[in-house]
Amino acid sequence: MDSILKIYDVKWTSNTAGPSPDGNRRTEIFIRGCKKAAEGNPCNGCFNPKLWNDTDTAIGRPPREIAEMVDEHAPNKFVTIVGGEPLDQVRPLAELVSWLKFYGFHIILFTHYTLEEIKIATVADEEYGDDYLALFQNVDVLVDGEYDASQRIYDDEAGDGLHDAIGSANQVVWDIRGWRKGDSGTIDGLRAGDLAGLYIC
């Protein structure tokens, strides 16, 4: 059986999903479900509690079909994937980003997991380790870490690709293109609270 990715919605044009040279317009894909929240431990002040449950009204589609739909309807080649928690569906997510990259998209991924946790999973998780590796062959920017309302920096009118996209200062922005070069040591990360803005040229 082909893998299925449970999504909640797709926002074709968002100006609050990260930077792009096209006036910060990006397509935003909302992934359904968050195991952490479902177990009673959501991020403090989570933006999207309606996405915690991965069963009610979930739209399950093959990753290739979702990518084809995005390629057909997106206004440009910039996409952001949020949740819920996207990495709770890492196998179909890895397929989705592979297809999105095939269609030429720049990809930002938000997750409450830290990059260090993900790097450990690539080795320690016998079932999904290869899926984590495959994921990072295609994602361009990772924003990691739990949202913390006490460190909120989000301002949907900021217009800088950072404060109108990232929730709290503790989250880290990683340029993970080094993974595609086979050299994870080249990954650069900066804490969102230490940045003035986020731009893609």
Model-derived features: positions:
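Core AdoMet radical
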Residues: F47-R61, P75-Q89, Y103-Y128, Y132-S150, ...
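Glycine-rich phosphate/diphosphate-binding loops that line cofactor/substrate pockets in enzymes
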Residues: M69-A74
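Alpha-helical scaffolding segments of alpha/beta enzyme cores, especially the outer helices
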Residues: E65-E68, R91-F102, A134
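Charged phosphate-binding loop/patch that engages nucleotide di/tri-phosphates or the phosphate backbone
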Residues: V172-C201
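A generic local structural motif
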Residues: T13-N15, I66-E68, Y128-D130
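Residues that form or flank phosphate/diphosphate-binding pockets in enzymes
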Residues: A38, D88-R91
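Canonical Radical SAM [4Fe-4S] cluster-binding loop centered on the CxxxCxxC motif
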Residues: D2-R61
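Short, acidic Gly/Pro/Ser/Thr-rich loop/turn segments
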Residues: K35-E39, A149, R180-G182
